[in-house]
From Swiss-Prot:
NCBIfam families: DNA_YbaB_EbfC. This is Nucleoid-associated protein BU482. InterPro entries: YbaB-like_sf, YbaB/EbfC. GO terms for cellular component: bacterial nucleoid; cytosol. It is found in: Cytoplasm, Nucleoid. The lineage of its organism: Bacteria, Pseudomonadati, Pseudomonadota, Gammaproteobacteria, Enterobacterales. It comes from Buchnera aphidicola subsp. Acyrthosiphon pisum (strain APS) (Acyrthosiphon pisum symbiotic bacterium). Disulfide bonds: none annotated. The keyword Cytoplasm applies. Keywords: Cytoplasm, DNA-binding.
Length: 109
């Protein structure tokens, strides 16, 4: 099935990939992205762990409908979550470049 050298190379490659993944996950955890809604009237900043760091609301919205403000805050958070997920996928896919992974195998994000 595997030759002695082939298995050793596979194990070495797996260890290198694991080290790269740990480094990238640490980088992602330190990142912050900002999602927006209502053409920038509401902004939500989250970190790589999807924890909310900051919410900014344009003062003009404070006189408007409470329901609309709540909807915009949720939309901004969802936008920020989508953005950090895209960054995670992009960084993690860079790890597997050049590796011969089985069809259907996806790197964990």
């Amino acid at each position: 099935m595997f030759t002695k050298g082939g298995l050793g190379n596979l194990m070495k490659q797996a260890q290198q990939m694991q080290e790269k993944m740990a480094k990238i996950q640490e980088e992602i955890a330190q990142m912050e992205v900002t999602g927006e809604a209502g053409a920038g009237l509401v902004k939500v900043t989250i970190n790589g762990a999807h924890n909310c760091r900051r919410v900014e609301v344009d003062p003009s919205l404070l006189q408007d409908d409470k329901d609309m403000l709540e909807d915009l805050a949720a939309a901004a958070f969802n936008d920020a979550t989508r953005r950090i997920s895209e960054v995670q996928k992009k960084k993690m896919s860079a790890i597997s470049t050049g590796m011969q992974l089985p069809n259907g195998f996806n790197m964990p994000v």
